[in-house]
């Protein structure tokens, strides 16, 4: 269009000109580029006649998607399911700390896959006296970088099942701009190589679930398409339903072939930081938030101590507290198992650097060993890195960023210095680099004067 006018709107979706890339005018009507794309998708669907042959003039769809299929891989048996102690032992190899959360998840996951084995044996259907086993989804509550996603990912790795991660903040209610909840299932299906049976036994982790809380516990009189609306859309999926998943993603339309996935066997793990939830719990318990957990400047308590106290308060969490926070009762009822993860202190961060199977220190040692350099980290350097990560308040995620900063110049210079066979990162190097100074490199004048 020759002239921009914010008052002009698409006659089909109602978006104004400043919300779309292109708005095309017709005799008394307007259509935006997004609606044109949707029309093209509908028209591009392969049209067939009553005999199943392509209709004359019909063109195949532009996007070729792999066909969904069912595998011959047998369902898990009771004997093949690892016991809770075995599950926790495996988690200990990858995740440091969080013992209470590991125990909760080990039991919940064991019971979930026992339920699948029970159904696979047909006992739940043939025995009249058999008790119906309902699934128990899991809610993880903890600050950023404390290991929520890693716990879920490690479980899926141990059980050898497909695993998908979704961000709740991108989801919207059907009919609005954003992702439909069915797109979560598409990610899981893609992780399973379009194997429907495998996907139906997988694990889905929905992150940032606290961001879809409604603004108050009272039902909203206005449309909340990314909060309460998403919670409502997730209800059936969490409980168990046969969902129609568009194989190409995006919005569903009437002429699109969809893949049907039964979600009753999928384990959903929801996680979020739930900032401020401890205040809701304290209010219910009748404790003054300021007096019970004073700010750092009033009593000299550190922020770390406050975070630890918040985790201790959340041990008294009740479903009604989550309702007051903004989750609807129906949503909470479909996630009956909850676990509170504690914030990571400096000692735990030190352990994360060195102890897990894929610890960061081991990763960088392996990288430099390919250049015939034996890399070592002094104990006080490990402590300094953990202290800096703790100061940044982003949990274990800060560790990789700090080491990458420290090692950047080293990894740039060392491969070209064949005479250097070993190198030790010291505390002074960590402190100098995190303070903005250049890290001395081996064989340079800067190192000789240090």
From Swiss-Prot:
GO biological process, one term: cell division
Domain ClpX-type ZB per the UniProt entry, residue ranges: 1-51
Gene (UniProt): clpX
Keywords assigned: ATP-binding, Chaperone, Metal-binding, Nucleotide-binding, Zinc
Transmembrane segments: none
Region annotated Disordered, chain positions: 50-78
Binding site for ATP: 143-150
Positions bound to Zn(2+): 10, 13, 32, 35
Name under which the protein is recorded: ATP-dependent Clp protease ATP-binding subunit ClpX
Recorded family membership: Belongs to the ClpX chaperone family.
Pfam families: AAA_2, ClpB_D2-small, zf-C4_ClpX
């Amino acid at each position: 269009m020759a002239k921009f006018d914010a008052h002009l709107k698409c006659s089909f979706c109602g978006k104004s000109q400043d919300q779309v890339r292109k708005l095309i005018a017709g005799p008394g009507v307007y259509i935006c580029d997004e609606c044109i794309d949707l029309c093209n998708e509908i028209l591009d669907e392969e049209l067939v006649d009553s005999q199943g042959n392509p209709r004359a003039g019909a063109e195949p769809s532009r996007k070729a998607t792999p066909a969904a299929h069912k595998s011959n891989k047998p369902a898990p048996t009771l004997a093949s399911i690892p016991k809770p102690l075995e599950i926790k032992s495996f988690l200990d190899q990858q995740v440091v700390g969080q013992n209470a959360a590991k125990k909760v998840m080990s039991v919940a996951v064991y019971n979930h896959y026992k339920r699948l084995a029970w159904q696979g044996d047909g006992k739940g259907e043939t025995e009249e006296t058999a008790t119906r086993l309902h699934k128990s989804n899991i809610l993880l509550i903890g600050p950023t970088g404390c290991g929520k996603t890693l716990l879920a990912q490690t479980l899926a790795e141990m059980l050898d099942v497909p695993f998908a991660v979704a961000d709740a903040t991108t989801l919207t209610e059907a009919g609005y701009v954003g992702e439909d909840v069915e797109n979560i299932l598409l990610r899981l299906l893609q992780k399973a190589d379009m194997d429907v049976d495998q996907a139906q036994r997988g694990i889905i982790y929905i992150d940032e679930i606290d961001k879809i809380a409604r603004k108050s516990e009272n039902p909203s009189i206005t449309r909340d398409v990314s909060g309460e609306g998403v919670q409502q859309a997730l209800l059936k999926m969490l409980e168990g339903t046969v969902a129609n998943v568009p194989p190409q993603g995006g919005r569903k339309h009437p002429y699109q072939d969809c893949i049907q996935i039964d979600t009753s066997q999928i384990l959903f793990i929801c996680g979020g930081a739930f900032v401020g939830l401890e205040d809701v719990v304290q209010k219910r318990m009748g404790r003054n938030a300021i007096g019970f957990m004073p700010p750092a400047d009033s009593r000299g308590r550190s922020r770390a101590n406050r975070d630890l106290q918040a985790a201790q308060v959340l041990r008294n969490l009740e479903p009604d507290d989550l309702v007051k926070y903004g989750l609807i009762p129906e949503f909470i009822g479909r996630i009956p198992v909850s676990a509170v993860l504690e914030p990571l202190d400096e000692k735990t961060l030190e352990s994360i650097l060195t102890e897990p199977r894929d610890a960061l220190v081991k990763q960088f040692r392996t990288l430099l060993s390919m250049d015939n350099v034996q890399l070592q980290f002094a104990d006080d350097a490990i402590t300094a890195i953990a202290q800096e990560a703790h100061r940044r308040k982003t949990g274990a995620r800060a560790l990789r960023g700090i080491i990458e900063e420290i090692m950047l110049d080293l990894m740039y210079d060392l491969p070209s210095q064949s005479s250097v066979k070993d190198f030790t990162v010291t505390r002074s190097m960590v402190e100098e680099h995190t303070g903005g100074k250049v890290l001395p490199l081996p064989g340079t004048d800067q190192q000789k004067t240090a």
